[in-house]
Amino acid sequence: MDGNGRWAKKRGVPRLMGHNAGMEAMKRIVIASSNMGIENLTVYAFSTENWKRSTEEVSGIFKLIVKYVRSELAELVENDVHINILGDYSMLPDDSVKSIDKLLKETEHCNGMNFNIALNYGGRDEIVKAVNELLADREVTDGPGISRDVTEEEISAHLYTGSLHCDIPDPDLVIRTSGEERMSNFLLWQSAYSELMFTDTLWPDFSEDEC
């Protein structure tokens, strides 16, 4: 979901208005994806690097999370959308954490599309956490001091998307908006064999017609 800031700059409005427009685009894409029968949709909402932005912008983004849950929860449940969070959202402000907890609880019974929201997420950070979690688990199961090779399957299982967590498949397609042609630390392990699509369209203007 890239291009909110540039969208706002082009219109001479505050960056937070761009993020608000981006949230409206996300609403459209989520429901459209569900209606199209897409089984898994993952969006990059807030990266581990986004903390470097201004306090005002970061705070505004977190307030939008609360706003999104309040306005969209009923429709998500109605459309049988199941929510997963990729990343450590416990570091967010309390009101955002409570809203996300409610979102997860209210949609845990839903069996339709998996809507996966990457929050405080970084691809490298995810891999490091997965390896550390794996090694900690091994110390419990194998005992201290026992060494054996780590496998791809074990790392995959310990990722946020892995079988020990959300258990969602690797993406078939990764779409990057705003004209940038790089992954920017998004699903680095999982997208090894994904098709990549780059579009100049800024995220707030993106629609299902481009898919």
Model-derived features with residue positions:
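Flexible, compositionally biased loop and terminal segments
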Residues: M1-C211
